[in-house]
Amino acid sequence: MATKIRLKRIGRRNRPFYRLIVIDSRKQRDGAAIEEVGWYNPIDDGHSYDLKGDRILHWLSQGAVPTNAAHKLMRRAGIAHRWHLIQQGMDEAEIDKEMKKWELNRED
């Protein structure tokens, strides 16, 4: 099954709110999700979001492909950088060290 990590729109008219979900790529945008892995609120001043990094990394390791919007959120949270380091074959200590550097240089 080809899975995607993408945004599911909920909320009322002119007040969007999104859930980050893992879903079969053949399903419609608001179809039944396999798992909810976070949320994103673009209306708040800080564009608030909360992502379950461990579950997203699990699904990425299973072959799930994020959409562009989902990838932007993952990049903002540092999950995309962590996934990149895992793909390079770094061990956990090196990854933690690189993530601390990333936290310091972050432009959020």
What are these regions (language model features)?
Residues 1-108:
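Structured, basic alpha/beta domains of bacterial-type, RNA-associated proteins
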